[in-house]
From Swiss-Prot:
Name listed for the protein in its UniProt record: Protein E6
Recorded name of the encoding gene: E6
Xref: Gene3D superfamilies: E6 early regulatory protein
Locations listed in the record: Host cytoplasm; Host nucleus
Keywords, in A-Z order: Activator, DNA-binding, Early protein, Host cytoplasm, Host nucleus, Host-virus interaction, Inhibition of host innate immune response by virus, Metal-binding, Modulation of host cell apoptosis by virus, Transcription, Transcription regulation, Viral immunoevasion, Zinc, Zinc-finger
Length: 150
């Protein structure tokens, strides 16, 4: 993998597979934090979440599900700035919500329009973390509710 220059290194798992003649199914990639190989499901989830490949010493890394959520929580604790309703997010950015890529604060999946609409309809605030507006996807929002149930 050392044959690629920094400017031409693949940024997505799809590009990485294409460049090296692999498929997502047979891609073996390590977690940037724990160094374990991602499972097939984690590779597909990473691709689905449209996350970028991290390069260290000309070697590609991704993030396993546990480390991604764990580090997202740490990032939120360290870098949380404020929460705001949708109209404040639109006013501050100058863009409509549907024009913005807002990720889930836990799993980093880009929120769908229906997930953004849920924030609007329920009056749920978005969080400004590390200079990015974040929210909660349907899956992670469900996990929070499950923890509160008896």
């Amino acid at each position: 993998m050392s044959g690629t220059s920094a400017s031409s290194q693949p940024r997505t798992l799809y590009q990485l597979c294409k460049e090296f003649g692999l498929t997502l199914r047979n891609l073996q990639i390590s977690c940037i934090w724990c160094k374990k190989h991602l499972t097939g499901a984690e590779v597909l989830a990473y691709h689905f979440k449209d996350l970028v490949v991290v390069w260290r010493k000309d070697f590609p890394y991704a993030a396993c599900a546990f480390c991604l959520e764990f580090n997202s929580k740490i990032c939120a604790l360290r870098h949380y700035e404020r929460s705001a309703f949708w109209y404040t997010v639109e006013k501050e950015t100058g863009l409509l919500l549907e024009e913005q890529q807002i990720r889930c604060a836990l799993c980093q999946k880009p929120l769908s329009q229906s997930e953004k609409n849920h924030h609007i309809d329920t009056g749920t605030r978005f969080q400004f973390i590390l200079c990015q507006w974040t929210g909660r996807c349907t899956h992670c929002r469900g996990q929070c509710v499950e923890r509160r149930l008896p």
